[in-house]
A protein has these predicted regions:
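Peripheral, non-AAA+ core regions of ATP-driven protein-machinery
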Residues: 1-217, 221-224, 265, 468-469, ...
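Short loop/turn elements that form and flank the Walker-type P-loop nucleotide-binding site
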Residues: 59-62, 99-100, 130-132, 150, ...
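Conserved alpha-helical scaffold flanking the Walker A/P-loop in AAA+ ATPase domains
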Residues: 207, 264, 269, 279-302, ...
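Walker A/P-loop
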Residues: 218-259
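The Walker A (P-loop) glycine that initiates the GxxxxGKT/S ATP-binding motif of P-loop NTPases
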Residues: 220, 284, 306
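Conserved inter-motif catalytic segment of the P-loop NTP-binding fold
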Residues: 244-278, 285-286, 392, 432-440, ...
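Walker B catalytic acidic pair
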Residues: 299, 305-306, 317
Length: 505
């Protein structure tokens, strides 16, 4: 007997349809699994055998061969247990092949026949829909993800027996109701910019960063509020669109980080890895590449606190994602490209002791130590950070004032308006904020005569690079958008230059 069943696995952050071919023939009892299965897939033989027996279904004591096509793709995860079991029952005439057409089965089997949760179900359902499947059967624990994709019927099953009885017509299951992804997009944050005392320049810089998707470095002594400000950056970003929310949810589903209570990621990611992180954990890696922190921060914020404490080689890996908005990882088994459009927010002290330039504490570092500390961050990486600002100590009068600062909601309103202007301008290019390339800078960041004179004077005075020139123009374009100005004026350019050059080597 021969049967073909549709299943799904993941490759990178995308789903891939797998054709599970099951052949049961005469011969000595054996169970061969071919088609480049990973260890978790090879172990499915024992899980499937026990699940069938404990669900009171016969397991064929003959020669069994299971092929997972395409054979050149490595099959990861345990989600192929269910289609293998369905294929064996089809060969045993428990299920009719005609009733399995255009149906996809995803799930890990426990030894007692229950169907366990698997990672990456959202990507698999999206791929199943793209491949023309009409129905998908997933574990009950993955129901939240199954509600998100429209245009395909998604069923949840708790046990193997429940699935078989449904396919036999003895017990009818109903497909999951579809969920409007953005219906509950009213995120209440536990932190707010209103809590921040003083630091008006930093607040302004973070507003510009949020409006234009610009990277920012904050330099200041310990306790001046760098981390506090960075953690509030995500609260002033615009709400995610449906496409952005699905993309982020897909990434978090793949790596198994999707919150239990949430069906979809509506809050923009905020990732803050420790400075001891390895390059593979930051960018992604493994024998079969998996997403790293730069991808987990996609459409959100990547906060690197104590920037010079990171390994220099690790920081240098940020060059490609900062420039291209994606990261390419090549391994012997596979080459993957992951999305990584994030706002880099970095913070550091001005020197090893932290008090260089402080108005109260005296710096105890030698000049050689300060120079060595600054050299930990390379010039090419610094050149890719749009805004670099100094933070001063918060005065006692600012700290004790009863006046609350401007709230995150008020700042977010201005950010959203600026983003709408950028969306209208860049919609044809598939961009949604001012993270433009060279050709877009030339087209959309033109200067009048007065602004051109300001740019030329500071370009020569500060020995700026061509990249610095373009990044200043992009920040100036965002400042103009926040001001509701169609053109970049000299005042917008002057502010952009100040925010770019206040931290000098």
């Amino acid at each position: 007997m021969f049967a073909q069943i549709l299943g799904e696995t993941t490759c990178g952050i995308d789903g891939v349809q797998i054709l599970v071919e099951v052949d049961v023939s005469n011969g000595l009892p054996s169970f061969d699994l071919v088609g480049l299965p990973a260890m978790a897939v090879r172990e499915s033989k024992e899980r499937v055998k026990a699940a069938l027996r404990n669900s009171n279904y016969p397991f064929p004591m003959t020669r069994i061969t299971v092929n997972l096509a395409p054979a050149d793709l490595r099959k990861e995860g345990s989600g192929l247990d269910l289609p293998i079991a369905v294929g064996l029952m089809t060969c045993g005439r428990i299920l009719e092949p005609e009733k399995l057409e255009n149906k996809v089965f995803i799930g890990e089997l426990s030894l007692d026949g229950r169907i366990r949760k698997v990672s990456g179900v959202l990507s698999m359902i999206m791929d199943a829909k793209k491949c023309g499947a009409q129905e998908v059967y997933i574990p009950q624990a993955n129901a939240a993800e199954g509600k998100l994709i429209h245009g395909i019927d998604v069923y949840t099953v708790a046990t193997l027996k429940e699935l078989v009885e449904h396919l036999q017509g003895k017990n009818t299951l109903t497909p999951l109701p579809k969920e409007n992804i953005l219906q509950n997009n009213n995120k209440i944050y536990h932190v707010d910019f209103a809590d921040v005392k003083g630091q008006l320049v930093a607040r302004r810089a973070l507003e510009i960063a949020a409006a234009g998707g610009h990277s920012i470095l904050m330099v200041g002594s310990p306790g001046c509020g760098k981390t506090m400000l960075a953690r509030r950056l995500v609260t002033i970003l615009p709400p995610m669109t449906e496409a952005e929310a699905l993309e982020v949810t897909k990434i978090y589903s793949i790596v198994g980080l999707l919150p239990q209570a949430d069906s979809v990621m509506l809050e923009r990611p905020f990732r803050s890895p420790h400075h001891s992180i390895s390059g593979s954990a930051l960018l992604g890696g493994g024998s079969t590449p998996r997403p790293g922190e730069v991808t987990l921060a996609h459409n959100g914020v990547l906060f690197l606190d104590e920037l010079p404490e990171f390994e220099r080689a690790t920081l240098e890996m940020l060059r490609q994602p900062l420039e291209d908005g994606e990261v390419s990882i090549s391994r012997v088994r596979a080459a993957m490209t992951f999305p990584s459009k994030f706002i880099l927010c970095a913070a550091q002290n001005p020197c090893p002791c932290g008090f260089l330039g402080d108005s109260v504490h005296r710096c105890s570092c030698k000049q050689a130590e300060i120079d060595s500390y600054k050299r930990k961050i390379s010039g090419p990486l610094m050149d890719r950070i749009d805004m670099q600002i100094n933070l001063s100590r918060v005065e006692f009068s600012e700290l004790k004032t009863k006046e609350k600062g401007e709230s995150s909601a008020a700042i977010r309103e201005r950010v959203v308006k600026a983003r709408l202007l950028q969306q209208e301008r860049l919609e044809a290019l598939g961009m949604h904020c001012n993270a433009m390339g060279r050709s877009e800078v030339v087209k959309y960041c033109q200067l009048d005569a007065a602004a051109q004179n300001v740019m030329e004077r500071y370009f020569n005075m500060l020995n700026l690079s061509a990249r610095s020139h373009d990044r200043i123009l992009k920040v100036a374009r965002t400042i103009a958008d926040l001001a509701g100005s169609e053109n970049i004026e000299a005042v917008h350019l002057a502010e952009a230059i100040q925010l770019r050059t206040s931290v000098r080597p």
